[in-house]
Amino acid sequence: MRLVKKNVIINGIYEAGVRYPEPANISYLWNFGFFSLVCLIIQLVSGILLAMHYSAHVDLAFNSIERLVREVDFGWLLRYVHANGASFFFIVVYVHMLRGLYFGSYQKPNAMLWVSGVVIFLLLIITGFLGYVLPWGQMSYWAATVITNLVTVIPVVGEDIVIWLWGGFNVDNPTLNRFFSLHYLCPFIIVGLVGLHIIFLRENGSTNPLGVKSNVDQIPFTPYFTIKDLFSFMIFLVLFFAFVFFAPNYLGHPDNYLMADSNVTPAHIVPEWYLLPFYAMLRSIPNKVLGVLALVLAIVVLAFLPFLTISEVRSSYFRKIHKHLFWSFLALCFFLGFLGSQPAAAPYLTCGLYSTILYFVYILVLFPYIYMVEKVIIKSILKTNKK
């Protein structure tokens, strides 16, 4: 113990991983932050190994991945771990964020913790899109063409930015090189932001299901939460490798097993499943500028939740109306994801437009201000009980 106390690094690890106090009543939903870190490590390691075999050239990219899968020892494992790792990364991040919404973890004094998380989420989306292009399959190529074209809505400099992204006048070899470089860089930026996120977490400590301060009822991280994390980690690995070994392409798209062809347009251009709700918002609005604005604001607006919310009570555990709102909001998100996977035709576009409006009503109006309604109801109940 004396050696631990003397060494700054060892003592820091000891304090963070052994003695760090956590609320005694936190549930397994709080493990998804740990899962996010696990997924980030999986993606970093598998991505670096994949980059050793990848050729960022339009004539070689598709074949280099096929060669990796067919000829390199355990190359198939590398590819499917990385591909499914991205999907699982988004699953755990979505659950992590939804848990924050449900239990009010985004409210002050954790505002900066939430904002840093939204920034990480935005960077994850960018990284995921860049990686989706790299296999240079049919869906990769056309997704890159459609999404990069959206940058043209930026006034004055939009056209110039698109030409710079493309490295020419259409998606081609320079585009692939740029996307590969940025996709390789972004995870390391995310690592830095995760470090900042953890610093903000340590500043005020973890929240809990009741949404109240728990300075008294706390227990050390080890052994209680270490065992809890290890148990849930084993379950996570079982589920993850079940997809890797038995359904490696279930979360992918079959068109990406066809080499990119600029002369053949897929019948239905879609991004990865985890971006479908935002894609539904983008295409449901007829005006291109407003569609892109809705797409960006749908993510950015989440960062303003801590500053819009006026509730004195955090957790939905004590807020029945907020609880029902949360579950209806979750159903809306699933519905938007379904709409994003469907062809761009009626009635999907009409439903998408109304769902997009409803999404912003939830975030900007209902979640922040429903507390006023709850407060009036509580006061009326208290008055009735007094009588």
Swiss-Prot record:
The terms describing its cellular component in GO are: mitochondrial inner membrane; respiratory chain complex III
Gene3D superfamilies from the UniProt entry: Cytochrome Bc1 Complex, Chain C (1.20.810.10)
What keywords tag this UniProt record? Electron transport, Heme, Iron, Membrane, Metal-binding, Mitochondrion, Mitochondrion inner membrane, Respiratory chain, Transmembrane, Transmembrane helix, Transport, Ubiquinone
Organism for this UniProt entry: Dictyostelium citrinum
Assembly description? The main subunits of complex b-c1 are: cytochrome b, cytochrome c1 and the Rieske protein.
Q: Which residues cross the membrane?
A: 32-52, 76-98, 113-133, 179-199, 225-245, 290-310, 325-345, 353-373
* Cofactor: record remark: Binds 2 heme b groups non-covalently.
Membrane topology per record: Multi-pass membrane protein
| SUPFAM superfamilies cross-referenced by the UniProt entry | a domain/subunit of cytochrome bc1 complex (Ubiquinol-cytochrome c reductase), Transmembrane di-heme cytochromes
The record, for Pfam families, names: Cytochrom_B_C (PF00032), Cytochrome_B (PF00033)
Please cite one Gene Ontology biological process associated with this protein: mitochondrial electron transport, ubiquinol to cytochrome c
Q: What does this protein do?
A: Component of the ubiquinol-cytochrome c reductase complex (complex III or cytochrome b-c1 complex) that is part of the mitochondrial respiratory chain. The b-c1 complex mediates electron transfer from ubiquinol to cytochrome c. Contributes to the generation of a proton gradient across the mitochondrial membrane that is then used for ATP synthesis.
GO MF entry, a single one: ubiquinol-cytochrome-c reductase activity
Its needed co-factors are: heme b
Binding-site residues for heme b b562, renumbered to this chain: H82, H183
Binding site residues for heme b b566: H96, H197
This protein is called: Cytochrome b
Question: Which family does the record assign?
Answer: Belongs to the cytochrome b family.
Give the free-text miscellaneous remark of the entry.
Heme 1 (or BL or b562) is low-potential and absorbs at about 562 nm, and heme 2 (or BH or b566) is high-potential and absorbs at about 566 nm.
Its localization reads: Mitochondrion inner membrane
